[in-house]
Amino acid sequence: RSPVPARGFRLRRGAAGEPDPTPPPALRGVRITAAPYRERPIGILAERSGRRLTAVLACRVSSFSLLDPESQERRLARWGLVLSGASSTAIRRIGWIERTAPAQGDELARWLHAEHDPAVPLRGTPMIESYLELIGTTARVTQEHEILVAVQVDARRVRERGAESVTRALVEETERVAQGLEAAEVTVLGALSPGQLARALRTAFDPYARAELTTLETADPGRDGLAEANAWPVGAVESWDHYRSDGALHATYWIGGWPRVDVSPMFMDALLGRSSVVRTVAVTFEPIPPERSTRDVEAAITRDRADRDLRQRFGQSETARQRQAEDATVRRESELAAGHCEVRLAGFVTVSGRDGEDLRRASSEVLEHAARARLELHRMYGQQAEAFAFTLPLCRGLKS
């Protein structure tokens, strides 16, 4: 339970101060801070006493499935350049998050009320009745898609010391990633402000709170997201196979198997495409410095040669699996020599529902879609609270 409601607000010169934030145990130590940038501040998620800072970009992508194969390959290649370009910088990790959430669903109805001909009654006309029925049907399944790209820097990768230097490095690297995304034909809407970052966290813990937040924002157009204390759930309970936070239940899965055959750039469309459930797909990328990759592959080649010489000395035959492993190592060396970058990655999927039955139905649908994409999902039993944090814009999920 969050102690924030019982703390109250302290009045200072007639103004109410903000209560101190209290993140849940899995996120203890995470704070939302701000960095000045041009006309407005950028929101930053700070961890480990400010030694790790994360900024979040809101993005939009035109329908990838409608592009021709050449355009798809071009965009993927440019995304690869974003990752490879980060391998020798202060960037520690890059997180990609795509989430669906319940849409308001009444935009078309509001438009109809505002734009209809006053001479035509809203009720009783067969055409309008049919249209309202169609709107009512689609509203129940309408989903909003959001794409967030998190950029995390580590103080140990920044040459200059001091909190200001780390913050400056984060802003610079976030700008560079944004430029790379735009080159990949991704529309970057901008970096989230502190209030918008708090709102993004709040709607991750309780996706069904969006309607209430939208109502508040409509009544107060100058409102910029939420205060930091309101980013976290009022109550959260971890169970063996799910995590409850405020008005939502969540089940988080680890992507434990990726396609083992050649696939098209569209292979994840079955999971990321049209969906009637509330879910989040998050992939954390950790670019590996080229010198480290080169050192590892050279050691592997030396080891393979020593093993082959030893087998020849004792007259042992070479198996097909051993030959394949040696060929893979040589191929890896060739790719590094050509300038390609290696990355570590981990993927997680969080499925949300209003109650147990809703969560069960949503989980079944997501598992079916993942199977079509040749992805193996494993439920994170016994660690749902920590696993849920892996699908937040904190670039978590990989062991340091």
PLM region descriptions:
Residues R1-S400:
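Extended, folded cores of ATP/NTP-driven motor/assembly subunits in large transport
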